[in-house]
Amino acid sequence: MTLQYQTIADCVGNTPLVRLQRMAGNTSNTLLLKLEGNNPAGSVKDRPALSMITRAELRGQIHPGDTLIEATSGNTGIALAMAAAIKGYRMILIMPDNSSAERKAAMTAYGAELISVSKDDGMEGARDLAERMQAEGRGKVLDQFANGDNPEAHYTSTGPEIWRQTGGT
């Protein structure tokens, strides 16, 4: 059997670029929309999540079977849960307890373990706990907020893809 895609990771990217046909007001501007919701985990965060894990692997910082830890409140956590599952990592996601049930369900569907912090502690509390857990040797924090591999995904993937789809115009 020949498959077009070997893993879900192969489905990340190459999302459609469409021209908005109608806009409110009198404008002659062209507006193009990149449909990143077509990525497997459903958002623009799929690319950075896969990038952060893949590039950390290439640097020898993490290996399949390791535990990854991340503070999140949404789409990055869902995408990291997916990417970790694909690549064989245990994923612990730390989030404020007022995060939506739907996001939590998506994360656990990919096998992530969730830890809640109080809504009063918020994302800062989630980040602090992630750092403490890493200091205790309980896993490796990817740190989406300061990790250069996060935006790099768009320089190496999204940008060239848009250039190709528009013919450079």
Swiss-Prot record:
Belongs to the cysteine synthase/cystathionine beta-synthase family. This is Cysteine synthase B. It catalyses: O-acetyl-L-serine + hydrogen sulfide = L-cysteine + acetate. The modification N6-(pyridoxal phosphate)lysine is found at residue 45. Pyridoxal 5'-phosphate binds at residue 75. The keyword Glycoprotein does not apply. Pathway: Amino-acid biosynthesis; L-cysteine biosynthesis; L-cysteine from L-serine: step 2/2. GO terms for biological process: cysteine biosynthetic process from serine. Its EC number is 2.5.1.47. Residues 146-169 are annotated as: Disordered. Pfam families: PALP (PF00291). Its cofactor is pyridoxal 5'-phosphate. Keywords: Amino-acid biosynthesis, Cysteine biosynthesis, Pyridoxal phosphate, Transferase. It is an enzyme of class 2 (transferase). GO terms for molecular function: cysteine synthase activity. It comes from Pseudomonas syringae pv. syringae. The keyword Plastid does not apply. The gene is cysM.
